[in-house]
Structures are given as structure tokens and as C-alpha cells.
Amino acid sequence: MRKVYLAIALGFCCQGIQAQQSSYRWKVEAEAGVSCSVLDTDVSGLSETYYKVRPGFTAAIGAEYNIVDQLAVGAGIRFVQRDYLYQNLGGDSWNTRYNNNFISIPLHLGYYLLHNPYHEKGLWIKPQVGVYYEYFTSMHTKGMYPMNIMEGYKGDGSYIRYNTTYDFRKNENHLRRSLFGGEAGIKVGYSLGRLDGSIGYNFQYGFSHIYQDKASTSKTARRNSSVITAGIAYKLF
């Protein structure tokens, strides 16, 4: 009889532990990876002019809440480099490398497939969509241009090389610092209980025109990025 009581007690304990494990609602996560960005603008009227993708670094921390069933909402803070290369390959070719740094605040909604890591261990897949606000913290440019593109210049067409940091206090190009965008992506991960590991892909599309006065140019100019990350998460309660 004692063995029966002991078995029942152990059963209740196991159920209690399982219930406790399935009660997770919050998790914090950290991730880092590579961003590949380009300036999305119309250069069809400019002969042999291109904007090309350049890789950058991204890192983020955030929190996520399991709202109901498989649905979760998350937010965080993220650093992302949106770098790209401008090239003119005409007779007097020149180029500029743009290193653009942003701090952004993303908000996303995701849906877990296969397994819900808040309730069970195993492989999970999470498609997600969201929006973000970002602040343009700094821009560094490096490149060269031919002297003969300067008005009134007469000479041998030699090049000027430059390596500068943009002065946002003067903001001579009237760049917009507060920007908004949308993103969509997918994460694949594995839950070990409290700990999750994951890899993810996100496409980030800029809603905001990069200049303060869009009327000053008829061309659309936005920064778009593809981001690949690896991350870990820890469930709190």
C-alpha cells in the first residue's frame, strides 16, 4: 500500500513539474549576425551608376511574450549597420563606400509551428512580421572622385580621395534621422526547456524616404536589408 501511495505522490509531483514547465510565458533573447544592405533608388537615368550590397554587423536584445496558444509578440533594441557601395563606372569612374549605423526598436508578431517552445521541447519554426523605428546615429563615407567633375575645373582628371564622417549637426544633405520600416522573416530553433537556440532570416524594408524633404527629389530612396542571425533565449516564467 505504501508503494501505491508513493507512486501516486510521485505522479502528482511529476505533473506539478510538467505544469510548472508549461507555464512559461516570457523569454529574453540575444542575437547577432550579418546584415546585407542596399540603397533602393532609381538610377536608370544615370549611365553606368550602381548601388551594390555590402555586409555589415547587427546585434539585438529583446523580450517575447506568449499571448495565447502558438502566438507571441516581442520587442527589443537593435544595432544594425546598413552599408552599401555607390559606383559610377563611366569614363571617369568613382565610388563611395557608405557605413551607416542605426539603433532601432522592433516590434514583431510571430506564430510557432511544429512545437511551442513555451510548453514543450523540440524543434520549432516561427514565421514573423513586424515594424520598427530606427534612429540614424552615424554615417562614414570613404572613396574617391575625379577632379574634372567639379565645375570650372581644368586639369588632368586626377582623383581626390576622401575618408569622412558626416556632420549631422550641419546636416547639409538634409538626411532624415528618424525612420520607420517593416520586416518579415522566419526563425528556426530548438527548445531544451528553459533554453532555446535559433537561427533566423529577416527582410527589412524602409518605409521612410531618407531625405527630410522628399519634394526636393522625384526619386524614391530607401534603405533595405537582408539580415541573418543566430541567437539564444532564456525563459523566465
Regions from the PLM with identified roles:
Residues 1-27, 228-237:
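Bacterial Sec-dependent N-terminal signal peptides
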Residues 20-60:
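Short glycine/proline- and aromatic-enriched beta-strand/turn motifs that initiate or cap beta-hairpins
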Residues 20-26, 69-70, 114-124, 140, ...:
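Short loop/turn motifs that connect adjacent beta-strands in outer-membrane beta-barrel proteins
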Residues 30-34, 57-65, 77-79, 105-111, ...:
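Residues on the lipid-exposed face of transmembrane beta-strands in outer-membrane beta-barrel proteins
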Residues 38-54, 81-103, 135-179, 207-229:
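Extracellular/periplasm-exposed beta-strand and loop segments of Gram-negative cell-envelope proteins
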Residues 54-58, 68-72, 100-106, 124-126, ...:
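Short connector loops at helix/strand junctions that flank enzyme active sites
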Residues 97-139, 143:
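Hydrophobic, well-structured mid-protein blocks that either form specific transmembrane helices
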Residues 189-212:
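Extended, basic/helix-rich recognition subdomains
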